Amino acid sequence: MKKILCLAISLGLSLLLLTGCLFFPNPDNNKSGTDSSHTTADAEQTDSSEDVTEATGETESTTPRAQWTVLLYMCGTDLESDGGAATNNLLELQDVQYDDSVNFIIQTGGTNTWQNDLIDPGYLQRFKSDADGLTLLDQRKLASMGDPSTLSDFLKWGIKSYPSDKYMVLFWNHGGGSIAGVEFDEVFDSDSLTLPELGEAFKEVGQQFEIIGFDTCLMSTLENASTISEYGNYMVASEEYEPGGGWAYTDWTQYLMDHPGANGKMVGKQICDTYYSKCEYSGDDDMATLAVVDLKKIPALVTAFDAMATEMTGITDEITTLQDYVRGAIRAENFGGNTDEEGYTNMVDLGDLTINTEDVVSKTAEDVLTALFDAVVYDVHGTTRAQANGLSVFFPLAVTKEECDSYAEIATSGNYLRFIEVVVSDWSVSDAGTDINPAIVVPEQSGDSVTADEYTVDFNTYISDDGYYYLEFLNGFDSIQSVMFNFYYMDYDYGEYMLMGTDNDLVSDWDNGVFYDNFRGVWPALNGYYVDFNLIEEGVDYNLYSIPITLNGVDTNLRAAYVWDTEDTGHFEVYGCWTGLDSESGMSSREIVQLKDGDEVTILMNGQNW
């Protein structure tokens, strides 16, 4: 008989609080010596149905050429209306010692409420951040920040009004990965910039940017980099979700002021390092990622990936080889959501995907890794993102047909679409119709690929004499990509059972298709209460889990990991609460809330009658 014990998860973590102080303008930095009430230009106020012309102030004819112009596209959304995250980052900019070598220009919009007295949510407004605080330069009719014409209009205006040697465009908002895109506008039904729309806007502007940055979640993807590679020299973005505090604006902007001759790689490195330091300070560093990508190296990476995809399609006619590939792929580091409660982003690390499958795609894997490491010129990552290599790629872990259709619009490889067609049994390339990315060529379909209809899986389950639960496959085992177990609590008095989680702690014989449980009479608990513990990712040195809870009455997911100290022992770490992805828009939450003393946590479990 196995003893029932429990493992307690420590809650000794702090919570970083966002505050919404008012700050504009800054009289202490008023170099002109005039009263601070005059440092903000008064734009003509008209009805919001009409465009407002440029306020008096600097234009192309009066502004001297700078070394850098930073164009911050700040879509406040719920990050600002609920927590003042945008205001906090603008506050950070007020601690910078400015000079004339760098123009820092901001467009605001996309939120119902700004947590300060200066910015008006009824307009698109444009500001300059300098020693005098924020100066209102221009305001326009309210429009969706998720509309490509809104973006291109701001960029063209900023480039014309503030000429410089180098330009940086920075996106501030939520991100949702390759399919969902970026810049979700709260005022316009979470309208976002998809990758095709992002490319459309940059093409309209026609400017080469030194840095294209994403202070958002999940946008350091191969598909995003490929979309913008014609229009920038470097991309700075995160594979994983970002905490609500975002980048360290005081630190990296001050570096730019002090080193205006720096190139995009140098500035990008400072953005990464200062961001990671900020995450360390707030306790969010374990899951942090940020990378600098040389966009000029992306075409070579896309070519190498297409060659690997060709090799991948070549194995789809042999089920055992395909099984080996998919088993390796699902072990790759994945980002964002990976449970029903969190939602699925289907973004995996390109490097880890390749490393985990290189025995199967041995002819092309090395070329992909070489091109990847050549493109990612700098990156930072936390201890539980140890396999993050700087760029993720879409992989169909759990997708709908509609998501596959959307991916076809942004895919970098026609051969990869053919591979997806095989592993997603109810989708075909023809379903995407004419919406396939026109930049790629989709090869003719092979008639030899395996299909799910060809395989019937038969198995037996039984409990051995010593009390272990066995699963033995009799037929169709070659089509199985993974085996995990569900753990249930049975209440015989009430005739109910509750799902307590999903894990992979099994004794596995993949050669013979035999598996049995490794249950040792223990299960994770939070302050003595068992939890629904769901495996998100199996890492080399850790397993990452998600626990559905309510925190102070709000549904969310507690992220935790089991980290191995030795081959046989380890410990739990709690990383905080993340609400996951919006089920309609695909927008990723940016708020990571750490548990603190006094929080009220309710553990959620699925219970059913038998």
Q: Whereabouts are the PLM-identified features?
A:
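Positively charged n-region of N-terminal signal peptides that target proteins for export
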Residues: 1-4
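Bacterial N-terminal signal peptides
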Residues: 8-19
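Bacterial signal peptide processing site
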Residues: 22-25
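N-terminal, intrinsically disordered, polar/charged segments of Gram-positive cell-envelope systems
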Residues: 29-59
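Terminal, contiguous helix-loop blocks that mediate binding/assembly
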Residues: 50-63, 175-178, 182-610
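N-terminal extension/subdomain marker
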Residues: 52-163
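Structural recognition of the beta-strand scaffold that forms the well-ordered cores
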Residues: 69-74, 103-108, 167-171, 210-214, ...
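Active-site groove signature of glycoside hydrolases
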Residues: 158-178
